[in-house]
């Protein structure tokens, strides 16, 4: 505020709690990038009745539900499924186990999250979805960080395609 900032704009903020550290006099706006991803899936997945939006964990269910609602608002009402992954971690960035909650058999699953960091959660979720009969597994994330082992994990994964925005610049 003392620097003259009167508004902060973010895209799919990872930790909404940080907005509480901003002065009440400073406006805070967070925009969702989900609509940018929906268009890619609408144009590239032929049978929309076989799409299932998947939350990679309980923390992302609101985002997945919003993505699901926006998909339906794009003309696919009552055609798109919704599922969730339940994951357990003992330490940060290391997922011990994931369980599928919902019907994904024969579906084109789209895992929706705000960011992909080391891709551990994403790759384990994709594998679990395929083990439960998913026809294909895609991912959409606003922020593609791709830290540390992410590239090798993704290369070795069962993921069919990852779609991210350009919110994080990469040299390669």
Please place each PLM-identified region on the residue numbering.
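PRPP-associated nucleotide enzymes
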Residues: 1-172
